[in-house]
Amino acid sequence: MMASILLTLFRRTKKKYRRHTDDQVFNNPASKIKQKPGKIFCSAPVENLNKLRGECLRMMEMLKEETWRIYPVLLPQMELLERECRTPVTGQKVQMTYNWTQWLQTLYTMIMEENVPDMDLLQALREGGVITHQEQTMGMYVLYLMQRCCPMLPKLQFLKKIGKLI
């Protein structure tokens, strides 16, 4: 429910924003790459690599703009979550490094520094003992909200995962 409210607020604040939905590969089924079974198609001319690099830079700039636009909408929501979602007392005192607002600020800063945050990063921090399980859950929720509000973030996360992010 909160994600839908945030998306509504985000859509009201954005102006002159257009998502690119025209995908030539899916619109033109005749253009298929001839490939031998068991072979991976990975050879690309230099001009294609330059085009890919330019496309990655363009996508990163769009992500920065999307994040800059959604940050003022998400910040009050994170502050509200901080006040309303107190951790239950379990008998153990767990020192938390991050709260909701700090997660938002951390992920925002990472994106502005052109580092693409993803779930694998949060899992690695958890396994390394840097953050607790609860902090990881909070970070994943904030990242999920950012993915829902910033359409470019999942695309760049995918490029990062397959090793094509330049």
UniProtKB/Swiss-Prot annotation:
Pfam families in the record: C_Hendra (PF16821)
Keyword flag Iron: no
UniProt keyword annotations, A-Z: Host-virus interaction, Inhibition of host innate immune response by virus, Interferon antiviral system evasion, Viral immunoevasion
Physiological role: May counteract the cellular interferon antiviral system.
Species whose genome carries this gene: Nipah virus
InterPro entries documented for this protein: C_Hendra
Extra remark beyond the main annotation: The P/V/C gene has two overlapping open reading frames. One encodes the P/V/W proteins and the other the C protein.
Any single biological process term in GO: symbiont-mediated suppression of host innate immune response
Name of protein: Protein C
